[in-house]
Amino acid sequence: MIIRSPESEVKIMVDRDPIKTSFEEWARPGHFSRTIAKGPNTTTWIWNLHADAHDFDSHTSDLEEISRKVFSAHFGQLSIIFLWLSGMYFHGARFSNYEAWLSDPTHIAPSAQVVWPIVGQEILNGDVGGGFRGIQITSGFFQIWRASGITSELQLYCTAIGALVFAALMLFAGWFHYHKAAPKLAWFQDVESMLNHHLAGLLGLGSLSWAGHQVHVSLPINQFLDAGVDPKEIPLPHEFILNRDLLAQLYPSFAEGSTPFFTLNWSKYAEFLTFRGGLDPVTGGLWLTDIAHHHLAIAIIFLIAGHMYRTNWGIGHGLKEILEAHKGPFTGEGHKGLYEILTTSWHAQLALNLAMLGSLTIVVAHHMYSMPPYPYLAIDYGTQLSLFTHHMWIGGFLIVGAAAHAAIFMVRDYDPTTRYNDLLDRVLRHRDAIISHLNWACIFLGFHSFGLYIHNDTMSALGRPQDMFSDTAIQLQPIFAQWIQNTHALAPGATAPGATTSTSLTWGGGDLVAVGGKVALLPIPLGTADFLVHHIHAFTIHVTVLILLKGVLFARSSRLIPDKANLGFRFPCDGPGRGGTCQVSAWDHVFLGLFWMYNAISVVIFHFSWKMQSDVWGSISNQGVVTHITGGNFAQSSITINGWLRDFLWAQASQVIQSYGSSLSAYGLFFLGAHFVWAFSLMFLFSGRGYWQELIESIVWAHNKLKVAPATQPRALSIVQGRAVGVTHYLLGGIATTWAFFLARIIAVG
């Protein structure tokens, strides 16, 4: 830590009125580009307009102006998010059965959408219990609302209006910080100040205020709800906040106020800041008192972290020094120069953030079912499946986005002349070794993981079950995973002496938790079937990484095209007379990476869906006998490819295929329509540009013949545009098909 004398004055960090507000540009499509602003000669114009409208790098090379545009656009994004949230809360207030669900969450399903009776589509309003007819929703909003202490639809209404106000505020902020008071480049590059504010403000005070809300509002209200008190009888949130006696009736230590805090007698607060572990047997969710404790602890950590970096007071860490000191005996110059990269290339910064946020999103997916945070979430199987699937897809897209922006950084922002022997340079110099080893790992994983399945299919086909890899023949037990499970199951009393239960029931050892005759969670057994599919996961993830990493490491140059950096981020081929150089741009690697990301995530969500239906989800009788949805068939059926096709895809598609004439029929239509969208993508992916240009020219001839030819000359999509349209429909069709398949199935049987 370096202590310096404080600077004399605080610098002015904004420019006043830098850009006049005017709507004239709005009437000039493509005003950001000299070429596009001329207007359309051919139909390619509209595609270029869409491709470049948000590519601020292509509008100007002034980093300050680019930064301001991005900053302003972020406020627009936040405005849309608030608008969306407002819509969710408004539907909860206006069209939902939230109050009915609150009074009986085990027998009533959440619904917040009622279809109007036009052309007979009111058939979609299924009976969700309690006499309410509507579409069952699986977003988890009801469970979050209950956990945060919302007891009436009026409160949802008020929150919806509040979110609209914030949406308007964000729109105003976006305009204000671009047109009225635009930050200077130095403000965007002041990373210490940014870290302090984000850590202490967003994460620290954000967590602290949430912890405060939970203690003063959520906990008491949920206490009453769990005890079966009618929501209308429960005091309103502000009464708990203003009247300490109300809280003291539930938590006696509240009567002492903040005295225990300042006298360090913190154990007095153990009534509402607990460390129990496991699930609340009433709601099947994490103990809300554990969650409040967690957010308080997180808040303190981040409030401390938000005071670590040196700003106006000359005390604390400087990021540049930290990075430049970061070198080992084998890493050359180490992280020298990384500070300059991350403060001048927003693509590099974004790539890191996307990689971390994507990984974090996938971690969230896995914790939502293993440690269900909200009341009654664990027994709402449709919501559990939806939340897992949603967070897996989002995480996958963010990670591909990380590779995309890393490659854009390499092409547009990386300056090889100023970098020598730092870590990035060293990685680039031995990229051949990295990629060829990774390629070998992919080949090994692919042949061996798939080979185990093929062996099982062959033995099964030949009637030799004793020679298959299975829990009842040749066992391949995941011993390391089982060891980790066991370690966690034994942790309470050993490595975590204060906890009464392990972090998650899935680890094993503990009993199951059932709510309203449905299993919330129980120890998840792992066996040969999981061992096999986990190696498919390893394979698909490694191939995705191979494609994306190759795209980044070879974005500027390769043996095939040494001057690739001059061709840009996306280009079809290295010009005429250079055969075999198509589809090598960094963009094409992102394109291919998306398909493998889709493969990887599909296998994960299929595994999750079947495993949970087979080994976790189900009903429990009065005698304590658990009946799983698919009766534990995962261990024996999923060890062959045939089993996946027959007992998962085909057997579980029966609900969506047979949904016509029922309230689930919309899923049947979506299943069909999304298959169609997916098939439509193949038309773009499997044919060449010349084919379409030829077709278009004969169609134009016909139009000329009839004297109805348009002024704008029709053109086939460029190669890159065609692939972009193709991959978009492939992913959209595939994801929507999976969504319809999953939801029709789980709403019918769950």
Swiss-Prot record:
GO terms for biological process: photosynthesis. It catalyses: reduced [plastocyanin] + hnu + oxidized [2Fe-2S]-[ferredoxin] = oxidized [plastocyanin] + reduced [2Fe-2S]-[ferredoxin]. Chlorophyll a' binds at H675. GO terms for cellular component: chloroplast thylakoid membrane; photosystem I. Its EC number is 1.97.1.12. The chain crosses the membrane at residues 70-93, 156-179, 195-219, 291-309, 346-369, 385-411, 433-455, 531-549, 589-610, 664-686, 724-744. Chlorophyll a binds at M683, Y691. Phylloquinone binds at W692. [4Fe-4S] cluster binds at C573, C582. The keyword Signal does not apply. It is found in: Plastid, Chloroplast thylakoid membrane. The PsaA/B heterodimer binds the P700 chlorophyll special pair and subsequent electron acceptors. PSI consists of a core antenna complex that captures photons, and an electron transfer chain that converts photonic excitation into a charge separation. The eukaryotic PSI reaction center is composed of at least 11 subunits. PsaA and PsaB bind P700, the primary electron donor of photosystem I (PSI), as well as the electron acceptors A0, A1 and FX. PSI is a plastocyanin-ferredoxin oxidoreductase, converting photonic excitation into a charge separation, which transfers an electron from the donor P700 chlorophyll pair to the spectroscopically characterized acceptors A0, A1, FX, FA and FB in turn. Oxidized P700 is reduced on the lumenal side of the thylakoid membrane by plastocyanin. NCBIfam families: psaA. Belongs to the PsaA/PsaB family. This is Photosystem I P700 chlorophyll a apoprotein A1. The lineage of its organism: Eukaryota, Viridiplantae, Streptophyta, Embryophyta, Tracheophyta.
